[in-house]
Amino acid sequence: MPAQAFYEMDGQRLVPSGLTRGPWDPGAQHAGPPSALIARALERCEPRDGMEIGRITIEILRPVPLAPLKLRAEVVRPGRSVELLEASLSGPDGVLMRARAWRVASSAAGPPPERPAAGPADGAERPFFPTGQEIGYHTAMEYRFMRGAFLEPGPATVWMRMRVALVEGEDPTPLQRVMVAADSGNGVSAALDWRTHLFINTDLSVHLLRVPETEWVCLEAETLLGSNGLADTALWDERGRIGRAAQTLLVRPRA
């Protein structure tokens, strides 16, 4: 039976399915699902009513293998209205990702959100990169492009939705849905041809105005190139703007 989730629990470990596989290496995960696991650990770390994650920054220390994972999270700076949290994701050979997050007191003081110009029903499916992999992250997600495509270098606007659960038997939270999708900013807006160049992110920083209220998350992404690379992504749900994501990119020709 095909996997119905990115991960399943095995005691204190999370075991990845083939749906976590990324486009760069068949033995490594796309960073979206493990980023969402970190969000899950942060959400479960001493949660408090009236507080929301306002920012998560994840450092990707090395590729995440398709192997059992463990997570740790703690509050390192407690506070009445602002808290700093840290989390780590580890595999058989040590720590793979480290993260810091600000949890802040929520407020309804802002104006009504600006609505996106068009929703996922107006988008189109586009072919994924020719990885040769029949199963992976790309088959676990739905894509509806409003602008651009995987194989068309340049800015892109795409709606994304999870086809499967993050963890078997659990409904994904709004924050987890954002993190699964946000790591795709560099992929959907590639400035160079995937067949000739690598553009791998070393981090992911997500700033949130609010968590999404719909299953679909929209990435309005652009990749900028200098001596390094930067993927800059505006994040939306079907009600309006929810935040922004940024990724530092390692850019180089394929060997």
Regions found by a protein language model. Name each.
Residues 1-255:
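Terminal targeting signals and extreme-terminal segments of soluble enzymes
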